[in-house]
Regions:
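N-terminal juxtadomain amphipathic helix
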Residues: 2-85, 250-252, 264
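Short aromatic-enriched loop/helix-cap "lid" or pocket-rim segments at secondary-structure transitions
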Residues: 30, 37-38, 148, 215-219, ...
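Extended interfacial segments that mediate partner engagement and assembly in macromolecular machines
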Residues: 46-51, 59-146, 223, 228, ...
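Glycine- and acidic
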Residues: 78-82, 174-178, 216-222, 290-291
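Hydrophobic, well-ordered beta-alpha structural blocks that scaffold small-molecule cofactor pockets
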Residues: 98, 103, 124, 262-404
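Conserved SAM-binding loop
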Residues: 98-217, 227-244, 327, 342-350, ...
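Short loop/edge segments at beta-strand edges and connector loops
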Residues: 138, 156-157, 250, 361-363
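Contiguous mid-protein beta-loop-alpha structural module that forms a pocket-lining wall or clamp
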Residues: 213, 217-285
Length: 404
């Protein structure tokens, strides 16, 4: 199969948090592959130069280049949808516990979820909280019925195109789970929504946490689909720019992409507004220097891991057909393609492959495994669980990377 697509790439020239153009490169990633691309292998599948940038005015991190979203998020090229498994249920419970601390009057809540991708979170929250009404908003729903079987209204649009619907529904609670990191300009999107929504609306967002990504050395989770990399400081600066007040912020160490951050806010009462000073120059320079060191450690460690995998003789197998496998292969210098196969417990992935990684996926029940097979955990989202399973089930040698 030969890929003839030549997707457009646009340069992101302003910070999505404060609008500054004072951006500097932290990390160059030439020919970075697309993640989550399951399908028939194509050696010519597109790769794109990428850079991780830091705003020298506020310290926020974001990508330099935006690959055409029509390519990135097409059904053929983007696998992620909110899944239905134990890990996701734990993340939903975390959000529910977070909401309970906001002491919402559920019977008065008219909720909308933006960037829903499917109805799983909406069903979960609506069942647990008995909101007055619940709607979901995502272009993926453009061909679906207005109401689903759970009484949830479906709006097949981008949030910025659904402002009349938001007004019609008298929304006073808006939630978005893993949405803002995909948005080119979060400040502009939220400004637009704030101008067209009840001023007392409570907003709740979950995003990957840059703090936890750095702490866990999950720099493999820097990838094309995530334009923005939030930490506590950048969220607070964003809210200040929007004239909003932070109500609550919590970190989920077991969240996606190394860990997540959930925060709630609302429009600030002008009478009580406080403009905090940001002594940022020294802080940003320190952050820039620390990131450079952390990235150097990461790249060195994964190069060693890749060299070791390639050096090992005999049969070698990965465990975990992860969404991020393409970036793991990238940072290990193609070592994942030196494995014989990838095991995965998901029966739907059996005999599948990746469009940009030359390796097949096999269910454990279908694989020929003996005591000489060497295992490499290849899903860092489930790293500990995989090591535990391998230790209990297979008396084999296990090669782990620098992530725990």
């Amino acid at each position: 199969m030969v890929t003839e697509l030549k997707p457009k790439v646009e340069t992101i020239s302003i910070c999505g948090i404060d609008g500054s153009t004072n951006l500097d490169t932290v990390w160059k990633l030439p020919d970075l592959p697309i993640t989550e691309a399951y399908g028939e292998y194509d050696e010519n599948y597109p790769k794109f130069d990428q850079e991780l940038m830091i705003c020298m005015s506020c310290g926020h991190l974001q990508l330099k280049n935006q690959v055409d979203p029509n390519f990135l998020y097409s059904i053929d090229n983007y696998a992620f949808r909110t899944q239905n498994n134990n890990k996701i249920h734990k993340e939903f419970e975390f959000i529910q516990n977070f909401l309970s601390k906001l002491h919402l009057d559920s019977e008065q809540i008219r909720a909308i979820e933006i960037g829903a991708s499917n109805l799983e979170l909406a069903k979960f929250l609506n069942q647990r909280n008995k909101f007055k009404s619940f709607a979901v908003c995502d272009p993926l729903f453009s061909n679906q019925e207005k109401f689903n079987e759970s009484g949830i209204e479906v709006i097949g649009k981008l949030a910025e195109d659904a402002l009349e619907d938001i007004e019609r529904l008298a929304v006073n609670f808006l939630i978005g789970r893993h949405v803002l990191e995909h948005v080119l300009n979060p400040q502009l999107l939220l400004e637009t929504i704030l101008k067209n929504i009840d001023p007392k609306t409570i907003f709740v967002f979950e995003v990957p946490s840059l703090e936890l990504l750095r702490k866990n050395f999950r720099f493999d989770a820097i990838f094309h689909q995530h334009c923005q990399y939030f930490d506590e400081t950048s969220v607070k600066i964003l809210l200040q720019k929007l004239g909003c007040e932070l109500l609550l912020m919590e970190f989920n160490k077991e969240g996606s992409n190394g860990g997540s951050m959930v925060f709630a806010f609302k429009k600030q009462d002008i009478k009580n507004a406080k403009i905090s000073s940001n002594d940022s120059i020294g802080f940003i320079q320190k952050k820039f220097s620390e990131l450079k060191i952390e990235i150097e450690i990461f790249t060195s460690a994964f190069k060693v891991l890749g060299d070791f995998i390639k050096y090992l003789p005999g049969r070698k197998a990965g465990y975990g057909a992860a969404h991020m496998l393409a970036t793991l292969n990238y940072h290990t210098g193609g070592a994942i393609e030196d494995l014989d196969f990838i095991l995965d417990d998901d029966e739907l992935k059996n005999n599948m492959s990746y469009r940009n990684i030359g390796i097949g996926i096999v269910h454990p029940d279908e694989a020929r495994i003996d005591e000489n097979v060497i295992f490499v955990p290849t899903s860092y989202e489930n790293h500990r669980r995989i090591i535990k399973k391998l230790t209990e089930k297979y008396p084999n040698r296990i090669i782990t990377g620098p992530i725990f």
